[in-house]
């Protein structure tokens, strides 16, 4: 092949490759256009990605534009509907562990708040543990003297249920040394009581914003439930006390919508005493089991209707459930009057199950140690001593404390009834132990369709801490 033929051959081959390359590009463009024009079958250059995190919910709108990501943080969408909460309570055969925060054990080397009065409340999406901090951390000098109930440093904060009350995941709710909180299906409502004893004020927050206030009307330590309030069809109910802790005081029911108070009524309960009610929804009404800090070792029972009419009395059962208390065998029970002369008391709870009642109490008759829940046949309506079931939650070798009720909404469980749940506070430190501080952790239990074995889910922290040895 002469040189001219070689040049022609190479040129022809090059031209062929160029033509092939052009054809491939044309085919590529055609395929791309066909794919992008086919709605729903191909990727879109613009899109929205929603990411949720456990601690809080952060919604990101991420627009993917060529090779550039534009990230825009948008407000978390609120729920559209109020929860009904008119369903009946589920029948519980036993109570299974839901969560345990181990806050004091973790706090020996972690950044955990000094707290008291923890309680749990649920929204349609989650349950949260609320607690009253002392404005200080465990194993720190500012924990000294935190046995005191009321101070300007106390705040209501919350974490997802099961998390320790740590500084990294806690959410501020209100300035408070007494509080309640609940979710109506759209937003959280919190009530935080703070201020001087004679002129305390309760600030009602809705969606994190102060909306309304309640001023002390008796001038004697206005206080509230220290457990979940109750929302039914968008209206939220709670109980407050103002007056002496050891004689006749004044009691009121409050009703709010979207955080604004729309009704209130005085509770006429001469000779009786109501504090720290543990309430839950049941068949369209609010049922509360409370604390008599005056004389009764039986617990007050308050049932609230949506129109704020109410019935009030005492848990009928012939078994006492407050602390301190006398022997079970010496207790007769009363549906209308306080029985006993021990005075003082501790926050507690009970659940109506038809005519029966599940009631929690300390195992010790004289101190806040141990905890059990017992089922008393006909105990809601009669002076029955027929104890048909018992489950130990904390053995009597370990400290307990307050306890209270809440329910799992049907939006969480997909059941046709409200699951009864309770929490038990386990107080550590002063006044029972040699420390400079007082704090607590909690165990949370929920009703199930099966019997559950007794055990001791106690606090378990080894005291004293380093700060106590200085």
UniProtKB/Swiss-Prot annotation:
Reaction catalyzed: Hydrolysis of alpha-(2->3)-, alpha-(2->6)-, alpha-(2->8)- glycosidic linkages of terminal sialic acid residues in oligosaccharides, glycoproteins, glycolipids, colominic acid and synthetic substrates
A biological process from GO: carbohydrate metabolic process
Keywords: Calcium, Disulfide bond, Glycoprotein, Glycosidase, Host cell membrane, Host membrane, Hydrolase, Membrane, Metal-binding, Signal-anchor, Transmembrane, Transmembrane helix, Virion
Region (Hypervariable stalk region): 32-86
Processing after translation: N-glycosylated.
Membrane topology: Single-pass type II membrane protein
Ranges for region Involved in apical transport and lipid raft association: 11-32
Entry annotated with the keyword Transport: no
Disulfide bond sites: 90-417, 122-127, 182-229, 231-236, 277-290, 279-288, 316-335, 421-446
Subcellular location: Virion membrane; Host apical cell membrane
Virion surface compartment segments: 36-470
MF term (GO), any: exo-alpha-sialidase activity
Annotated binding of Ca(2+), by residue: 292, 296, 322
Active site: 149, 402
Intravirion side: 1-14
EC number: 3.2.1.18
Region entry Head of neuraminidase, spans: 89-470
InterPro entries assigned: Glyco_hydro_34 (IPR001860), Sialidase_sf (IPR036278)
Matches recorded under HAMAP family: INFV_NRAM (MF_04071)
Homology family: Belongs to the glycosyl hydrolase 34 family.
More info: The influenza A genome consist of 8 RNA segments. Genetic variation of hemagglutinin and/or neuraminidase genes results in the emergence of new influenza strains. The mechanism of variation can be the result of point mutations or the result of genetic reassortment between segments of two different strains.
Quaternary structure annotation from Swiss-Prot or TrEMBL: Homotetramer.
Protein name per Swiss-Prot or TrEMBL: Neuraminidase
Gene: NA
């Amino acid at each position: 092949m002469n040189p001219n033929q070689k040049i022609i051959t190479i040129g022809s081959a090059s031209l062929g490759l160029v033509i092939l390359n052009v054809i491939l590009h044309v085919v590529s463009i055609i395929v791309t256009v066909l794919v992008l024009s086919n709605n729903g079958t191909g990727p879109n250059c613009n899109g929205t990605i929603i990411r949720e995190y456990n601690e809080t919910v952060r919604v990101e709108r991420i627009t993917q534009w060529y090779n550039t990501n534009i990230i825009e943080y948008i407000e978390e969408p609120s729920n559209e509907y109020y929860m009904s909460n008119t369903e009946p309570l589920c029948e519980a055969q036993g109570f299974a562990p839901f969560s345990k925060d181990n806050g004091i054990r973790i706090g020996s080397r972690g950044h955990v708040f000094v707290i008291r009065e923890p309680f749990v409340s649920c929204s349609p999406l989650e349950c949260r543990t609320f607690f009253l901090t002392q404005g200080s951390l465990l194993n720190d000098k500012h924990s000294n003297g935190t046995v005191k109930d009321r101070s300007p440093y106390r705040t209501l904060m919350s974490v997802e249920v099961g998390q320790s009350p740590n500084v990294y995941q806690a959410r501020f709710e209100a300035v408070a040394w007494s509080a309640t909180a609940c979710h109506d299906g759209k937003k959280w409502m919190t009530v935080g009581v703070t201020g001087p004893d004679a002129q305390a004020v309760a600030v009602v927050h809705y969606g994190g914003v102060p909306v309304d206030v309640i001023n002390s009307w008796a001038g004697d330590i206005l206080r509230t439930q220290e457990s979940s309030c109750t929302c039914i069809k968008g209206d939220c109910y709670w109980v407050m006390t103002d007056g002496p802790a050891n004689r006749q005081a004044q009691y009121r029911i409050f009703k709010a919508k979207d955080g604004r108070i729309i009704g209130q009524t005085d509770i006429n309960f001469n000779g009786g005493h109501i504090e720290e009610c543990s309430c839950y929804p049941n068949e369209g009404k609010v049922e509360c089991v409370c604390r008599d800090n005056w004389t009764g070792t039986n617990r007050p029972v308050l049932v609230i209707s949506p129109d704020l009419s109410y019935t009030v009395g005492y848990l009928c059962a012939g078994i006492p459930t407050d602390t301190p208390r006398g022997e079970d065998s010496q207790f007769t029970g009363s549906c209308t009057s306080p029985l006993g002369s021990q005075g003082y008391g501790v926050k507690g709870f009970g659940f109506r199950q038809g005519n029966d009642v599940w009631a929690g109490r300390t195992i010790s008759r004289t101190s806040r140690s141990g905890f059990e829940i017992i089922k008393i046949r006909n105990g809601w309506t009669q002076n029955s001593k027929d104890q048909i079931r018992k489950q130990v939650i904390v053995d009597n070798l370990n400290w307990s404390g307050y306890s209270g009720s809440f329910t799992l909404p049907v939006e969480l469980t997909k059941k046709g009834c409200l699951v009864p749940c309770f929490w038990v506070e386990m107080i550590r430190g002063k006044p029972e132990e040699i420390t400079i501080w007082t704090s607590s952790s909690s165990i949370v239990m929920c009703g199930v369709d099966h019997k559950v074995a007794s055990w001791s889910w106690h606090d378990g922290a080894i005291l004293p801490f380093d700060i106590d040895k200085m």
